[in-house]
C-alpha cells in the first residue's frame, strides 16, 4: 500500500486544480468591467479550494485538515452562487452553467467523502489527534476509492 507524502498526490487536489483551470478559461468570456467584481470573486473562491486542501494537508492534525476541507467545501457553494449570477447576467450560457455546476457537485462529493474518511480513520485508528509530523499516514487506495476516482474532467 502507498502512503501519500504531499498534497500534490491527492486525487481531490488534482481535480481542484483542473477545476481552477476550467473556471479561469470560463471567466475569460466575462466582460472586462467584471475583472474586479464577479470575475475576481469566482476565481478567488476557485483558487481557495485547492489552497485549503494543500494547507490542510500540511497541518499536524486530522482535525485541522478536516477544518480546511470544510472551508474548501464552502468555497464550492460560493462558486455555485456565482455561476447563477453569471448565468443571469448572460456571461455564460446554459450549457456552460450546467457543465460547470456539475463539476462543482462532483468536487463537493469528493471533499465530503474525504472528510468522512478522515473522521472514520480517526475513530478507528487513534484517539490521539496528532499525526506524523513528516507525512500523513493513511492507505492511499482505501481513501482513493472512498472519495471516488478522479472525475472525468474536460478542460478547454
Question: Where are the language model's segments positioned?
Answer:
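Short, C-terminally biased terminal segments at protein or domain edges
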Residues: 1-55, 59-156
